[in-house]
Amino acid sequence: VGADAVLLIAACLTPDECHTLTIQAHELGLEVLLEVHSTSELSYIYKETDMVGVNNRNLGSFVTDIENSFRIAEELKKAIAEIDFQTPPLLVSESGISHPETIRELRSAGFRGFLMGETFMRTDDPGSTLEELIHGI
């Protein structure tokens, strides 16, 4: 039993720290989910980055705005296209996701992973909620 991945939050690190920690994580057999909140943090993406998550929750105010993923999506795809990846990173939209139509729209914008927590914490039956989401996609 152990971890498969680590979360590196760009807002808490310098680009060099992020790169060093990514290399160290890989040496330990871990994948890295790099979390960004704005286009100014796209410079934290390196060719070794496995996944890039766009957090839709403002870390200062804790307000969630799903539009953050859509605002960043095009610049994120451009930044990734400029890097010589062996395998391009998986794009993940994080927080504020609760409806199948939102997931469909995020998929159209290039996201393939979806981090959801609050939706399941607020329901009495997380299993049914997940089933409804899956069938709605």
Which ranges hold each PLM region?
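Glycine-rich phosphate-binding active-site loops on the catalytic face of alpha/beta enzymes
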Residues: 1-17, 54-63, 96, 110-130
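C-terminal helical cap(s) of enzyme catalytic domains, especially alpha/beta-barrels
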Residues: 72-75, 107, 122-137
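Short loop-to-alpha-helix "cap/lid" segments that border enzyme active sites
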Residues: 13-20, 39-47, 51, 59-87, ...
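Catalytic cores of alpha/beta
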Residues: 1, 34-48, 93-116, 128, ...
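Alpha-helix boundary/capping residues
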Residues: 25, 49, 76, 110, ...
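Short, well-ordered coil/turn segments that N-cap beta-strands
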Residues: 3-4, 28-30, 48-50, 87-89, ...
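Metal-dependent enolase-superfamily TIM-barrel catalytic cores that perform enediolate-based chemistry
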Residues: 4-34, 44
